[in-house]
Amino acid sequence: MRTTIARRHLLRSAGALGLALAGPRLALAEAKTLVAATFPGTWSEADRNVILPAFKQKTGAVATQSIILGGDQVSRLAAAKGNQPPFDVAFFDSPQVIDAVRDGLIVEYPVAKSPNFKELLPSAQDKWGPKITMQVIGIGYNPNKITTPPMSWDDLLDPKYKGRVGLTALNSQLGIAFLVEVNRLKGGTDDNFDPAFKFLAQLLPNVGAIAANLGAYATLWQQEQVDIAPYNFNFVQTLKAKDVPVELSIPSSGAVGWSTSLHLVTNAAEPELAVQYIDLHLDASIQDQLMKPPYDAIPTNAHVKLEGAITKSLVKSQDDLAKIRTIDWEKINPQRSALIDRFNREIKT
């Protein structure tokens, strides 16, 4: 625990020293450093290139990134509970929010101190923290090999795709969301996943590879080892930017996804700065920037006009975003370990 606190103290001291060198008056006024969690990949790049400079310009304070996945954030916050947390702002997907609230790791978001909060879509205004974007899954496919966009999850079963279908393990939101959606379409419930596993068993002859994680999954696409597979919008856009031949098709059964949100951590060292940092992510001009390549983040501010890849692949308007089907993570989270074990036992092996 002392190591975590010492490291954080060093980050803050370094920030204060840099400001002191810049000028005594500035150092006295703003010798503060915020520590904010962010996801690896596109989001860490977006925060580094867009958010951090804007935050410094607006507040005069320095923000540093802690690049870490949501589940690991929960673990670190839990380990530090009762002491100074390792970061002030948490960056979660929907499943981690439930765990963080249950364990008292985040506090209710102070809406009155966040002027941009009221501009969010109603579905993005959560009392535990604003939803800053969405992740939407569909069918990824190689347009050089598949000229007609697939419109049904059942298309994955087509014998012509033998050995060319990809899957990812259930340790990712993508894997779980795919399982839940297929289960729903096949008549299952959140208490009965037999239909989903029956579908996966039927799919096995077509499966060419099952990636252990999302990084390995991206490699399958980059090396063109798969032609068709469940994927999400943001990852497809990231690969397309690298000239990987991949497109996303939303099945006729509709889009399904989850939210990504920001949260004020319990006992945050810099709560006021944390709220300003979070509120900056809600600003319409910031979300407009993040909607464009190379970030392609789906905006949640109602004043941002949708355009580009989002309108081509996903939805045409903000009203359509509200129609994206979500997952009942309250029911799924307690089963997640059992579902992963069953997948590893029946499918992955």
What are these regions (language model features)?
Residues G138-K145, E181-R184, S259-P271, I278, ...:
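A bilobed periplasmic-binding-protein/Venus flytrap-type ligand-binding module shared by bacterial periplasmic
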Residues E30-I98:
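Early extracytoplasmic/lumenal segment of secretory-pathway proteins
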Residues V265-I324:
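Mature extracytoplasmic/periplasmic domains
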Residues Q135, K198-L203, K240-T266, A302:
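Periplasmic-binding protein-like
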Residues V97-D99, Q222, D227-P245:
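A ligand-binding cleft/hinge motif common to bilobed small-molecule-binding domains
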Residues M1-G18:
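N-terminal secretory signal peptides and thylakoid transit peptides that target proteins
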Residues G41-R48, P86-Q225:
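Extracytoplasmic ligand-binding site segments that recognize negatively charged/polar headgroups
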Residues D320-T349:
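Conserved C-terminal helix/tail region of periplasmic/extracytoplasmic solute-binding proteins
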